[in-house]
Amino acid sequence: MAKLTVKDVDLKGKKVLVRVDFNVPLKDGVITNDNRITAALPTIKYIIEQGGRAILFSHLGRVKEEADKEGKSLAPVAADLAAKLGQDVVFPGVTRGSKLEEAINALEDGQVLLVENTRFEDVDGKKESKNDEELGKYWASLGDGIFVNDAFGTAHRAHASNVGISANVEKAVAGFLLENEIAYIQEAVETPERPFVAILGGSKVSDKIGVIENLLEKADKVLIGGGMTYTFYKAQGIEIGNSLVEEDKLDVAKDLLEKSNGKLILPVDSKEANAFAGYTEVRDTEGEAVSEGFLGLDIGPKSIAKFDEALTGAKTVVWNGPMGVFENPDFQAGTIGVMDAIVKQPGVKSIIGGGDSAAAAINLGRADKFSWISTGGGASMELLEGKVLPGLAALTEK
């Protein structure tokens, strides 16, 4: 990576500003999935082991008005992080002001402080999300000229807590997580060991147009599953029953199929039900067509076999988006089948591009079998699309 990393700077005795991604799910104030906190530990531990004073910034959820702050404090995260680090984490509970400044100035080498949810600054004019210049300068002033960005999950956004701070420090560098994310995903797409197979699922073609176009150029095969299958079907005149379809994207789907040179591989059957919820009948279709009054909610057994065959011998696989409504046991066979087909390939470099795919791998017990599971859904999608990420572009060149 042509950007400076946390290993390229002297941290001893320095107040080091760190953007992490602690946007974790909370239920009644309890963290239900701590993966993002765990993923940030190597960078935080390295900073404090080097004698730095780590000042952490993160958002949590969306905050637009005062009422939205309810249940969005990072206090539970501070407690969880303290337990994981085995040391106190200072949590002043504010995003600016004398209370924060005094707590930072009182830090000693090897200590950690967590600033309150950066999006609390969005209540008064979206200062965080709109990369307010004054806020970026203020947060940058709290440190000693070093900023570490380790939040891949927000690298596709230009916010005050990443791009804003970067613009106002002497050195803006990548943390270990950001470095790994970029290395795995960018290398997989730009310099893959071949055969390179991409698998794209999810419900909407509109979300993946740019990704499909980019991967059709880079990959040897692009397998399509999930709800967007039926937009591709309808574009070819195949009956789809009551399945999800984006009527305004039929021409786009047709165009992608025509210019794919056979690289785009669609399912050949579906698991259909007579309703999305409260269904009384679930069955496999004979072929591509979905029955009248039914909707496709997963790829079928013939498609699983076809995708298994398409993945045989693959050396690089990038997967983004489940094959069906995997949260429901009746419609998770396709996602499980594809996961198992990926991980059984000898010597394969297998990458999950965040979001629902990551949740599927974790929930269905396959996470440890993949080479890399991205922590950022939107950011990984934009990398797969070949876009430049603002949070990465803002870092200091080597």
Swiss-Prot record:
GO cellular component, one term: cytosol
Key words of the record: ATP-binding, Cytoplasm, Glycolysis, Kinase, Nucleotide-binding, Transferase
Positions with a binding annotation for substrate: D21, F22, N23, R36, H59, L60, G61, R62, R119, R157
Gene (UniProt): pgk
Protein name: Phosphoglycerate kinase
Family membership noted in the UniProt record: Belongs to the phosphoglycerate kinase family.
Associated pathway: Carbohydrate degradation; glycolysis; pyruvate from D-glyceraldehyde 3-phosphate: step 2/5
EC primary class: transferase
SUPFAM superfamilies with a match to the protein in the record: Phosphoglycerate kinase
